[in-house]
């Protein structure tokens, strides 16, 4: 922490090489069971897990093309349960971007974007870009899931609500997806890579500008 008690800025991630294949580290966070692991598995392995098994910490690797650049994505899954609150920050070091996820059929997971995940990410990843993801959009049309939700006098989280949360946490983008039906899954990671690369370029320009001022 600095003298005022605010958390010190996170260490700057290592810059991706100037030519050839770029490499990015992306950490994904959100409540347990919100769809993080399914999203990562479908994108990186092409398989949707039929049974829920809580993750602790897992790493997935995938490639994406952004413009003419080949980008390697090192994707870090994290545990959303409170039991891992003290271990999870170990995943944040040298991160280029954080995906904050919630389940559109679970209002509590949506509320926790602002209550838990935004404060945690900004504390440990100060200055690192975020993208907000609404998961499990296919369940908005699932009659049984809707019945259960409405029995508790609740409604699915709408796209407009997701966009509002995105603005409140100052995330770079809000996207929705269904891992089960592979809807927008590739878009999530392609757009995340674009945001991370743009932030890297901006940081490099600022560093060069500071060097010029010193000279």
UniProtKB/Swiss-Prot annotation:
Entry keyword set: Acetylation, Cell membrane, Cytoplasm, Cytoskeleton, GTP-binding, Lipoprotein, Membrane, Methylation, Nucleotide-binding, Prenylation
Motif Effector region, chain ranges: 52-60
GO CC, alphabetical: cytoskeleton; cytosol; plasma membrane
Presence of the UniProt keyword Lyase in the record: no
Main location: membrane
Pro-sequence residue ranges: 213-215
Cited CDD domains: Rho4_like
Residue numbers of N-acetylmethionine PTMs: 1
GO molecular function: GTP binding; GTPase activity; protein kinase binding
Modified residues (Cysteine methyl ester): 212
Subcellular location: Cell membrane; Cytoplasm, Cytoskeleton
Covalently attached lipid (S-geranylgeranyl cysteine), positions: 212
Annotated InterPro entries: P-loop_NTPase, Small_GTP-bd, Small_GTPase, Small_GTPase_Rho
Similarity section: Belongs to the small GTPase superfamily. Rho family.
Role of this protein: Plasma membrane-associated small GTPase which cycles between an active GTP-bound and an inactive GDP-bound state. Causes the formation of thin, actin-rich surface projections called filopodia. Functions cooperatively with CDC42 and Rac to generate additional structures, increasing the diversity of actin-based morphology.
Protein name (record): Rho-related GTP-binding protein RhoF
Organism for this UniProt entry: Bos taurus
